[in-house]
Amino acid sequence: MTQFPSYASSFRLYKSVSEQYNDRSILDSVKRLVPEKVLQLIADDQNLKPLLHWFKNDFMKWMPKELQCKRCNNRPMSIQLVDANTGALRKTEIHVCNVCGSEQIFQRYDNILRIAETRVGRCSEWSILFGAITNSLPIQTRIVHDYLDHCWNESLINNKWVHIDSTLDYPISFDHPYYYEQNWGKNYEYVLAFSANSVEDVTTRYTQQWYLVQKRRGRKDKMKELREIYYRT
């Protein structure tokens, strides 16, 4: 299992994000980003297809993990990580070309309004901002992390937590919880969902191989320890 210090770092992030999800001024600001025609389409039946399409295809831009040099087209570039953990900035990625030495900088934020301003990121930025937008509708939404390499959202629709992944194409982006295990070969140990006051083990929702998850976990369930870390963070 991943060592607990790495969990603590992500817990700080998701607790901050969950608190922002309860900030009315932030939610009002991100709701104004959504075109009125999209809002009208989802208003009556909580159909998120128009919102997912707009967010992925018209609003956000994906940041690849490996960048190509804009000067000489060399790929891949070397990456230097600079931790910030101050204010809205989490860390800075400095991508340096091994051929010509030019640099590209990608700053990673935990501040919802800053992400909305830059409109670029990977799964964490996408899920953080998309969750804020759905909460503004208001459709209660939270962050989910698999502690492998991906995170997404869950929205409470018809009294059921539904898998939502704004980085994927519809219909896979909506209510396809087994997609990652079936198509990406995910070997889960803990999949956690976050709110401002709690962390929940939702692994069973995303696996059809629970016996293998239990084998990876071993005899001791570590959720009690993880909750204690979350509340202390």
Question: What label would you give each PLM region?
Answer:
Residues 152-157:
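A short beta-strand motif that forms the metal-chelation/ATP-contact edge
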Residues 1-118, 122-125, 145, 158-233:
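Alpha-helical and coiled-coil interaction segments, frequently adjacent to or embedded
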Residues 135-149:
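Short, well-structured beta-strand/strand-turn elements
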Residues 56, 60, 134-139:
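Hydrophobic/aromatic-lined pockets within catalytic cores
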